[in-house]
C-alpha cells in the first residue's frame, strides 16, 4: 500500500520503516534512475534550509523527477499577503508531491488536510521532522543490524528540537530497552510527547551518570531560533559538550549521532573517534529520501 502523507513519524508503521530500509539498500549506490520520470516534486521551504532542501532535491533528481519550488517565504506570494492554504492549492496544480518546511507547529498537518497530493513534512516549527528520524533509525539499523533492545540517550535541547520529537515517536514502532532524556530542566521533553511513548524513559541532567549504559547517544544543538527570551537562551546555550572525556566512558561499540548542523555541543576532536557516526548519518540522507519518494510516488504493483 502506497504511503499518503508523511507529516509525523507516527504515520509510518513498523513494516513501513523496514520496507523503506530495504529500498535504501537498493538506492544507496545508484547514480540515476527513472522511477519518477514525468513526476514533479515541489520543495516548499517557507523556512530556510541547506542540508534538508538539497538532499530532497538531489533525491528527487536521482529518481528522475523534475523539481520546482522556493527556498524562503520571502520569495513567495505569502510575502505579498497570500495565505498558506492558497499557496498549497496552487502547488497542487503544478506538482505530484509537496515537500514542506515551515516555522509554525502543525503547518504540515494543515497542508495535508487541504492537499490532494502527498505532503512530506521537512520540519514544522518545534513539532516534528519525520524524515530525519528515518535517517536516524536507518543509521542505527545499518550499524547494529537491529534497533530493538538498544539503549538510547538523547542529549541537549529536548524541548524545542523537532528531530527529538520525531525520533521518540518513531521508537514507539520498535522495542528500545530504555531511553535516557538528558537535558537542563528548562529544556525537558514536552509532556504531550512523553505521554505518547510506550517504552521506559528516564530523565536526568547529568550525562556522566548514564553514559556507560548507552548504545546510541543522540546529540542536538540548543535551538536559539526557537527561544523567545534571549536571556533564557544564554543560560542554557552551552549546557553540554560531548568531549573525549565523555566519549571514553561510552561502550566501545556505542555510537554518537547528530542531525546537524553542529555548533559547540560536540568537540571537533570527537570526530576522529570510532563512536562518531554523524557524518555517516548525514551521508544517508539522499538514499533514505529517495526511498521515501519511491514509497509515496513510485509505481507499485499493489496500487
Swiss-Prot record:
GO terms for biological process: 'de novo' pyrimidine nucleobase biosynthetic process; 'de novo' UMP biosynthetic process; amino acid metabolic process. Pathway: Pyrimidine metabolism; UMP biosynthesis via de novo pathway; (S)-dihydroorotate from bicarbonate: step 2/3. Carbamoyl phosphate binds at residues 51-52, 101, 129, 132, 260-261. Keywords: Pyrimidine biosynthesis, Transferase. It comes from the Archaea. Its EC number is 2.1.3.2. The keyword ATP-binding does not apply. InterPro entries: Asp/Orn_carbamoyltranf_P-bd, Asp/Orn_carbamoylTrfase, Asp/Orn_carbamoylTrfase_sf, Asp_carbamoyltransf, Asp_carbamoyltransf_Asp/Orn-bd. GO terms for molecular function: amino acid binding; aspartate carbamoyltransferase activity. Pfam families: OTCace (PF00185), OTCace_N (PF02729). PROSITE patterns: CARBAMOYLTRANSFERASE (PS00097). It catalyses: carbamoyl phosphate + L-aspartate = N-carbamoyl-L-aspartate + phosphate + H(+). The keyword Transcription does not apply. L-aspartate binds at residues 80, 162, 221. Gene3D superfamilies: Aspartate/ornithine carbamoyltransferase (3.40.50.1370). Belongs to the aspartate/ornithine carbamoyltransferase superfamily. ATCase family. HAMAP family: Asp_carb_tr. Heterooligomer of catalytic and regulatory chains. Catalyzes the condensation of carbamoyl phosphate and aspartate to form carbamoyl aspartate and inorganic phosphate, the committed step in the de novo pyrimidine nucleotide biosynthesis pathway. This is Aspartate carbamoyltransferase catalytic subunit. It comes from Saccharolobus islandicus (strain M.16.27) (Sulfolobus islandicus).
Amino acid at each position: 500500500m502506497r504511503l499518503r502523507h508523511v507529516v509525523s513519524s507516527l504515520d509510518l508503521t513498523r513494516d513501513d520503516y523496514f520496507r523503506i530500509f530495504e529500498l535504501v539498500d537498493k538506492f544507496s549506490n545508484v547514480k540515476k534512475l527513472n522511477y519518477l520520470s514525468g513526476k514533479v516534486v515541489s520543495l516548499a521551504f517557507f523556512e530556510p534550509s541547506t542540508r534538508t532542501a538539497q538532499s530532497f532535491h538531489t533525491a528527487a533528481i536521482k529518481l528522475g523527477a523534475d523539481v520546482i519550488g522556493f527556498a524562503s517565504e520571502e520569495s513567495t506570494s505569502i510575502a505579498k499577503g497570500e495565505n498558506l492554504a492558497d499557496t498549497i492549492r496552487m502547488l497542487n496544480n503544478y506538482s505530484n508531491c509537496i515537500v514542506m518546511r515551515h516555522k509554525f507547529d502543525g503547518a504540515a498537518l494543515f497542508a495535508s488536510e487541504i492537499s490532494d497530493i502527498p505532503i512530506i513534512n521537512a520540519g514544522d516549527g518545534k513539532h516534528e521532522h519525520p524524515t530525519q528520524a528515518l535517517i536516524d533509525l536507518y543509521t542505527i539499523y545499518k550499524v547494529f543490524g537491529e534497533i530493538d533492545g538498544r539503549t538510547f540517550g538523547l542529549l541537549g535541547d529536548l524541548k524545542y528540537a523537532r528531530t527529538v520529537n520525531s525520533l521518540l515517536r518513531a521508537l514507539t514502532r520498535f522495542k528500545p530497552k530504555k531511553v535516557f532524556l538528558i537535558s537542563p530542566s528548562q529544556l525537558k521533553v514536552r509532556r504531550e510527547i512523553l505521554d505518547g511513548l510506550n517504552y521506559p524513559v528516564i530523565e536526568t541532567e547529568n550525562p556522566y551518570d548514564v553514559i556507560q549504559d548507552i548504545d546510541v547517544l543522540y546529540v542536538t544543538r540548543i535551538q536559539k531560533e526557537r527561544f523567545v527570551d534571549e536571556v533564557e537562551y544564554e543560560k542554557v546555550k552551552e549546557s553540554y559538550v560531548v568531549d573525549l572525556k565523555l566519549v571514553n566512558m561510552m561502550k566501545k561499540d556505542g555510537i554518537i549521532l547528530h542531525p546537524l548542523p553542529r555548533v559547540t555541543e560536540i568537540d571537533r576532536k570527537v570526530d576522529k573517534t570510532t563512536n562518531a557516526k554523524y557524518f555517516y548519518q548525514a551521508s544517508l540522507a539522499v538514499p533514505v529520501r529517495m526511498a521515501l519518494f519511491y514509497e509515496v510516488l513510485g509505481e507499485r504493483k499493489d496500487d
